Amino acid sequence: DSVVIANEAHYNKLKEALKDFPIKIYAGENAISEIVEAAPIDIVVTAMVGYSGLKPTIRAIEAHKTIALANKETLVVAGDLIKRLALEYRTPIIPVDSEHSAIFQCLVGEGDNPIEKIILTASGGPFRKFTAEQMAHVTKSDALKHPKWHMGHKITIDSATLMNKGFEMIEAKILF
């Protein structure tokens, strides 16, 4: 088993955290792109933030690895390319993140039933009841005050502004 992280600065911390497990640890962009092509690997979980997941996903597809997709940005920036390559290399793409995984699981075995509509729900974000006047004064700090999670600034801002929901809509369109 292997774990690969893009940020080399966190290599020693990760190595220490996993020292009691029989896991090989690699770090760096080149390591990610190379490990996805390794012979003993059947499934590649792509869970990298933003655009960083694109190149490793392409290389994994070209190496005929099943893609367990947890990175919606890969499809947002290059969905047509990823879909074309997956068909060309006969590589399955299995969504493993939240709504898209649930949709995928509901559709297994439903090949004869064409999809008419997929509905993605949204809470409206933390500012859904704000007036236009209140919205004019919202700050980054306000958007980062999520009551339920601490997942980092990018995902918190993307969720608060509903950008993440927009990404999910694009992902659903490409996947289904």
Outline where the language-model segments fall.
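Predominant activation on well-ordered alpha-helical scaffold segments within soluble catalytic domains
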Residues: 15, 33, 58, 83, ...
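N-terminal glycine-/serine-/threonine-rich beta1-alpha1-beta2 phosphate-ribose binding loop
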Residues: 1-51
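Alpha-helix N-cap/helix-start capping motif
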Residues: 8, 29, 79-80, 97, ...
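Short, acidic/turn-prone active-site loops that include or flank metal/cofactor-
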Residues: 29-32, 72-75, 98-100
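Rossmann-like NAD(P)H-binding beta-loop-alpha module
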Residues: 40-41, 47-48, 54, 58-63, ...
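Mid-domain beta-loop-alpha active-site segment that forms a flexible
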Residues: 97-102, 144-176
